[in-house]
Amino acid sequence: MVIRSYLDKFCTIVKGSSYNTGLNPISELFYGRNTSRILFHFDHSKIKLMVEDGTFPDMSKLKHTLHITNAGSLDFTQLHTKESNSIGNGMKKRATSFDVIFFLIPKEWDRGKGFDYSKTAFNENYYDTKNPHNASRLVSTDGCNWFQPRNGYKWPEYGIYSTDTLSKEYDKFSSDEGSSIIIGRQHFDIGNENISLDITDIFNKFISGELDNYGICAAFTPDFENVFDTKAYTQQYSSEKYYDNYVGFLTDKTNTFFEPYVETKYDDYISDDRANFVIDKNNK
């Protein structure tokens, strides 16, 4: 049996920015001139109910996989194209050969009603203060951003957790010790791959109540987020500081059928071997 739980909240937070992007159909991860992280949430209550009512009697047979579609073109000629940035008036290019980590969000957060990542030369006319209908038309600082999970509350550290904190947890995750925060990692070869992550252990802990479900955050690994720290970054990456490297994913606000979801599979396979008999042996 296969069940889909569609993601119900998305938001991209940008380092040092109070802008909210909860209604944008594209969520972009950046490193280089800017740093961003992606927050998302899914409701596990439907699967929990099916466990409680006996539809899924054995949780060990459940497998949960996160699926989020890459917004990048499959046209390889576009992979090297530099584009106008979503943040400020700089440039961006497709990131390639990188890892993305996934960690648990520790607090309730609101997706907000913002759209744009920042004011740029392309959208500045929307914010003409002389026209009351355009003022702050697509910009909002309410709800989730780099500094807060929702109005009136603060993250444990800016950006949920600092890059330094994630770096320490990433070392634990990569060792036998394990991390209590980071739950997964996915490598991207070209940069246009979709997210496909096994989150079975965490999802089952949401069902059992061992963990509270506040959602998951995706980020570049700490060495990429430290791109401006020349001591922490090798010389081969020095050119990355002059523009943003990005990868984009379709959110639940996409107007396509590529909505992000968690796929739950229950292995209820029963083997019928009644046609197989062995002489001189009890056959059950």
Annotated model-derived regions:
Residues 1-284:
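Secreted, disulfide-rich extracellular signaling modules
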